[in-house]
Amino acid sequence: MSGPYIYADVDNLEGTQPVGNKQCAGLVQHYTNVGTTEYWTNGKKVRGNGLNVAKGTAVATFVSDAVEGKGYYANASHGNHAALYISQTDKGIMVMDQWAGDKNKPNVSSRLMRFLGQNRDGSYINPSNNGDALSVIMKSATSMRPK
């Protein structure tokens, strides 16, 4: 695996125009060399690792993320998310992100992804908005998507 992927000037993105396809993954792809989502896999969980996750690190939600390096990015129309890490508190994780088609978030901007926990089945509650669901993006040499 390779990574992490970091954009050190993340603070300067506040209020800028969306990039790429305007989807969340497009932001991290534009500002880092993380590549296509097909090869993304989960690195360390972000929550609780604030001292070990650099500002500007590309982070995302992953399916099957219980084991590091075994998860994959779903790349679905909803229920997954990618962003650039800023910081964290006991309430959640601050990220810089973009959303295609969200009239309330027309530009790249920072926001708090609150810690929302997991459902009984182990899936994350509202993963696109849940700081608990974020892991550092790493890149695999082979596709991580199920066949």
Question: What feature does the model see in each segment?
Answer:
Residues M1-A82, S87-Q88:
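Secreted/periplasmic proteins that engage bacterial cell-wall peptidoglycan
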Residues G3-G15, I86-K147:
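Aromatic- and glycine-rich peptidoglycan recognition patches
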